[in-house]
């Protein structure tokens, strides 16, 4: 098993047992189509984020090492990670309405389809999308609120960068009903105004 192999690897003997167990669960989640970030795994196992990140990276390296000589069809198939992967469960932390969740999913799919933000991690893009939705749906969440509620999956700076990029495509990403319902004008390109706290 991955856990046994991790435990026996000299390079990983400084790793805590909980981090090794967490890493194995992380791999299992990816293999079964329900990926979790190392930060989410850290929260589940109540371990520090650095230990979780180290454990997950080590487990991934070990898996790749073990499967290097295998035929492609026999290798573990880890599901792909996309912004839409995170939207539903990230949305639940913000208590978005069903309508707002569907809007966030629509935006995520558009971003993926057209590769609008190629330079950021999927979870960071998801955080940016949720701030974008929050901003245009007049929700009381600042970038710091999003950062904290999503467990530090993205920094305020990264969320703002993603927001700015999304804002460049707001005519593509925002259906007309958003403007009708919320009066979304998009007058602020940085997302720093709109009567929300910072």
Question: Where are the regions a protein language model picked out?
Answer:
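A cyclin-like helical interaction fold
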Residues: 1-22, 26-119, 144, 150, ...
């Amino acid at each position: 098993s991955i856990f046994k192999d991790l435990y026996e690897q000299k390079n990983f003997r400084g790793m805590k047992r909980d981090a090794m167990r967490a890493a194995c669960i992380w791999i299992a989640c990816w293999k079964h189509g329900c990926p979790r970030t190392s930060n989410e795994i850290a929260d589940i196992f109540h371990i520090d984020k650095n230990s979780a990140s180290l454990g997950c990276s080590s487990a991934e390296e070990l898996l790749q090492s073990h499967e290097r000589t295998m035929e492609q069809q026999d290798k573990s198939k880890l599901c792909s990670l996309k912004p839409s992967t995170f939207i539903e469960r990230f949305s639940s932390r913000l208590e978005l309405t069903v309508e707002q969740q569907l809007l966030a999913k629509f935006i995520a799919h558009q971003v993926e389809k057209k590769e609008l933000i190629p330079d950021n991690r999927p979870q960071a893009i998801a955080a940016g999308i949720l701030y974008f939705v929050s901003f245009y749906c007049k929700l009381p969440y600042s970038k710091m609120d999003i950062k904290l509620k999503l467990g530090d999956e993205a920094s305020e700076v990264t969320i703002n960068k993603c927001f700015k990029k999304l804002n460049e495509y707001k005519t593509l990403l925002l259906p007309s009903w958003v403007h009708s319902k919320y009066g979304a004008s998009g007058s602020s390109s940085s997302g720093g105004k709109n009567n929300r706290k910072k």
